[in-house]
């Protein structure tokens, strides 16, 4: 049995004292050997962490001791090696950045749809199904029939909706994302924009993959995740993708055969667009990573591009 538990969690809840929560939360993570990144904002908490079974249980016991977080849910998967390099708790304006004032999932959200009911909803021809994730995530897997907004960050989602859809014509809208947070916030935005019947997948793609048998699944491909596994398959086992440190795009087995793929430095997606300064920085970064690996030391550089997607 694998020893590392990976827990994805979020909850929209008003945390007026979120600044004061940072230090005790960080200490709880450190005391229990839990790694990863958690985001705190006045609107709630979001993140993905990993550790031993005991460490993860201790973290959630601490979180749930706060009445505001007593019902916080999370999704678990498992791996053989620690997928995070560092332990961080960041203070943010939003736990997932949409950038539209007044959007508040604590006050208004769409209708939650359980994983077991999702297939029936998205099979309805009157339902517009939108993938709220970024383009590089959608490229490696999505639901059958889903629209790809081709956004590079969640901040672009509102403009995409304004440019393509009309509440008067698009009566039913269903949305999904990796763990549920982006589509929940998107549903709040959509309601504010005048859309009336707005649905979103409770627990996101990860909950769907966990609960729906593969033979009944309408999911196609792998699912991008926010840790060093890069992707997971339908059974939540680690996929075969790597990730380019320069552009953050997932890199397939085929991509790694390209002459433009240099581990840690470039891939076929970004080779033509990299400046020499960026290449030089990437080479130095990769050199430090390899030296740390040879010494069996933690990742030497504080910021891992994989974790930045939490905020976008």
From Swiss-Prot:
Entry's PROSITE patterns? Answer: RHODANESE_3
The entry lists its GO molecular-function terms as: oxidoreductase activity, acting on paired donors, with incorporation or reduction of molecular oxygen
Q: Recorded E.C. number(s)? A: 1.14.-.-
Positions of region (Disordered):
282-312
What is the annotated signal peptide range for this record?
Answer: none
* Family statement: Belongs to the TrhO family.
Role noted for this protein: Catalyzes oxygen-dependent 5-hydroxyuridine (ho5U) modification at position 34 in tRNAs.
Q: Supply the PANTHER family for this chain.
A: RHODANESE-LIKE DOMAIN-CONTAINING PROTEIN 7-RELATED, THIOSULFATE SULFURTRANSFERASE/RHODANESE-LIKE DOMAIN-CONTAINING PROTEIN 2
Record protein name field: tRNA uridine(34) hydroxylase
Specify the species.
Answer: Pseudomonas paraeruginosa (strain DSM 24068 / PA7)
